[in-house]
């Protein structure tokens, strides 16, 4: 099967492993841009459980840079490739501070930022930050609404459960900053349908993707989607590097972008080979 021209490919882990060092990160970012990747992605964990405990896939000593700082660095070393957070754990952030940081990065990158957000899943991380784990879904909804208000309203004002403000301004306001919501809960699917430009599924195979998209369709039948948002863009990080046939099958399910995650622990040479392999096997 042929991979549709409309499908795009992102590169994950741009703030980890070889990309947690400046020289390697800059070289891999430029290589990915030249290879035809449409986007670079960075995830987030402020802290990791020690000792490692399920469901954390990362060891306590694994290095992971702050995604916004990493993407700002990558923006300075690239020109056209988009820059995505995959994902920001939104309820762990101050929404107005985050809104300012995101608007700044979007401005400095020339409008290349894609904001991926999720509610988080590591209770020890929330406990260390002093944020109630049980409130994370409600906080995410509240924070998204507050950020949209500060970004879009001529005289921003918002009064919610966890954040309230009026009589303030914050510029620059992004012209168009797409928002993807991640997660596999009923709330995550509702959040995507009601107010996001896209949905992001992580570590899914074809069957898992089909199941998730069925649940998104069910959510779309239950919740109203503003016409201004248009079609929901679907991004998926597959469990492993797909071949052309598998990529085409993802596209046939309705996936618009595959965000590819290299195996953990690759050095710069091996990551260079990975990018070149993707270019030959999927992009060109």
Task: Cite the ranges covered by each PLM segment.
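Active-site-adjacent structural elements that line small-molecule/cofactor binding pockets in enzymes
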Residues: 1-284
